[in-house]
Design a protein with these regions (language model features):
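Bacterial N-terminal signal peptides
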Residues: 16-31
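Acidic, Gly/Ser/Thr-rich repeat motifs that build Ca2+-stabilized beta-propeller blades
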Residues: 34-180, 232-235, 240-252, 307-341, ...
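Surface-exposed loop and turn segments in beta-propeller and other repeat-based domains
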Residues: 79-92, 141-157, 203-223, 269-306
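Short loop/turn segments immediately following beta-strands, especially the blade-tip
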Residues: 128-137, 197-208, 258-265, 342-348, ...
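Conserved blade-ending motifs and adjacent loop-strand segments that build the rim/top face
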Residues: 348-369
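Proline-enriched interdomain boundary motifs that mark the N-terminal boundary
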Residues: 400-411
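Short strand-edge motifs at loop-to-beta-strand transitions and within beta-strands
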Residues: 457-461
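Enriched for extracellular/lumenal, surface-exposed ectodomains of secreted and cell-surface proteins
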Residues: 467-487
Length: 497
């Protein structure tokens, strides 16, 4: 950062916040938990890597084993719920990495699996739908939704599936592996690696999935990008906020945070141009010069041991039994196993502290449908985290409901002489209280500009027209109204006669 940059007050605040995160001891943030958290064993499994519960039954747990099994645990009884070992390749960091049960699982039996397959070496990433029948999930029910090539390396597969607060399926993919994103995938909007993806899997069967309204890059599942290996992410069951644990390379591990309802739509989290709060390398990586803007993490920490650090992102504790842990975000590190928590907020997290527990070889956290949290060790044990209030089960949190929104777009003329400007107006409805809200104009995946709504909730753009083009306008959610996208507006070149 230059001296002139630090002269700006906002840059000073930003620098101070980063310094507090980076040198937490000096800022008094590294504290100890005031109330005891304990581990209660659920049992030992074969290479467990994830745990979740049925949406309507928090005592019906599903433990995911990396080699390809899903084991159901209910009232102390174990059954093999699904067995994908014949199609799962667990070389390197691959395997069956997580599952997500559909919100209507009780009636539909649908669940979604994230795994690396045996068809190719290195393995491709698959996201597939399966259906339970008679208390088990037959392999024959598998329906592939998404295949992502991963041709160079057997690491950085990502692996998280999670339904968001609006009912769409979010998917976390790594950058393709190797060091320093050699293939430049994370910054490439043509690649689905190094991304958070967002799809709607609830289709009529004619198409395998659809792109939900509001995805920022046209007909693409990409929601946000610039991630190295977002192995674990989660949504706050009370507020809907998205928290991502992105595994760093040699220097920093980071937590990225995006409040509901925006959830980081279109965000570029910076990799491989940035690592944590650290700025671009000099000289910049290919494709990074003049890039950005980047969305900084709310927290990062240095690799404690060279070559050994991997953040394990967790959940915001929302069960009342957790005492003063309530509202704090849990995370750990695969190398240290120490369970820690922080207070998630923008622009910087606060109050990072140890919870006084270690889980050797921790690979994941989990959450059941009443907000109780779990820790999973790849060595075999799965634990429930028990707070001072015991094992009480809180009711399902209600997600905030937003009002519907409409964006219109029109042009003074649909035909314009080449290299002349078009006069385009975009407007939103309802208008109440939305003055000053930003509206963006897009040509395909390229944002032409952003303007703020006037008192009658309209904005005007004057793009220069060089060829036939289609525009669309978008408005993000403001916490009251949902995000919305206009129809496409076609502008043609006026031919001389």
């Amino acid at each position: 950062m230059t001296g002139s940059g630090l002269a700006n007050l906002s840059e000073l605040i930003r620098a101070a916040g980063k310094a507090c995160v980076a040198v937490a001891l000096l800022c008094g943030l590294w504290t100890a938990s005031a109330e005891a958290l304990t581990l209660q064993s659920i049992g030992n499994f074969e290479g467990p890597i994830y745990v979740t519960s049925a949406p309507s039954n928090p005592d019906r747990l599903f433990v995911v084993e990396r080699q390809g099994r899903i084991v159901q645990v209910e009232n102390g009884t174990r059954t093999v719920f699904a067995d994908l070992r014949s199609i799962v390749n667990d070389d390197g960091e691959g395997g069956l990495l997580s599952i997500a049960l559909s919100p209507d699982f009780q009636s539909s039996g649908r669940l979604y699996v994230y795994y690396t397959g045996k068809e190719k070496t290195p393995a491709e990433i698959h996201v597939a739908e399966m259906r339970a029948s008679g208390g088990i999930v037959p392999l024959s029910s598998l329906r592939n939704l998404l295949t992502i090539e991963h041709p160079k390396h057997t690491n950085h597969y990502g692996g998280q599936l999670q339904f968001g607060p609006e009912g769409n399926l979010f998917i976390g993919t790594g950058d393709g592996g190797g060091s320093n994103d050699q293939e430049q995938n994370a910054q490439d909007l043509e690649s689905e690696l190094g991304k958070i993806l967002r799809i709607d899997p609830d289709t009529d069967g004619v198409i395998v999935f659809s792109i939900p309204p509001g995805n920022p890059f046209g007909p693409s599942p990409i929601w946000s990008y610039g991630l190295r290996n977002p192995f674990r992410f989660s949504f706050d069951r009370l507020t809907g906020a998205l928290a991502i644990g992105d595994v760093g390379q040699d220097l920093r591990e980071e937590v990225d945070y995006a409040p509901f309802p925006g959830l980081g739509v279109g965000a570029n989290y910076g990799w491989n141009c940035r690592e944590g709060f650290l700025a671009e390398t000099v000289p910049p990586e290919p494709g990074c010069a003049g890039g950005g803007p980047y969305t900084d993490p709310i927290f990062d920490y240095p690799n404690p041991n060279p070559g050994c650090a991997a953040i394990i992102g967790g959940y915001v504790a929302r069960n009342a039994s957790y005492g003063d842990l309530y509202g704090r975000y849990l995370y750990s590190d695969n190398c240290s196993g120490q369970i820690r928590s922080l207070l998630p907020s923008l622009p910087f997290a606060g109050g990072d502290r140890s919870e006084g527990l270690e889980v050797a070889g921790i690979d994941s956290f989990g959450e059941d449908s009443c907000g109780r949290l779990y820790a999973v060790s790849g060595a075999g044990p799965v634990y429930r985290l028990v707070g001072p209030g015991g094992e009480s089960c809180a009711p399902q949190a209600q997600q905030p409901e937003l009002k519907s929104s409409f964006v219109g777009i029109r042009a003074l003329r649909r035909k314009v002489k080449r290299n002349k400007r078009a006069f385009i107006t975009a407007f939103v409805s309802p208008c109440d209280g939305r003055r000053g809200q930003p509206v963006s104009l897009w040509e395909g995946r390229r944002r032409i500009g952003t303007r703020h709504l006037d008192r009658v909730c309209s904005v005007r753009f004057r793009p220069r027209i060089k060829h036939r083009v289609r525009f669309r306008a978008t408005v993000k959610s403001d916490g009251t109204y949902v995000e919305a996208t206009s129809r496409k507006l076609k502008i043609r070149i006026l031919r001389r006669r």
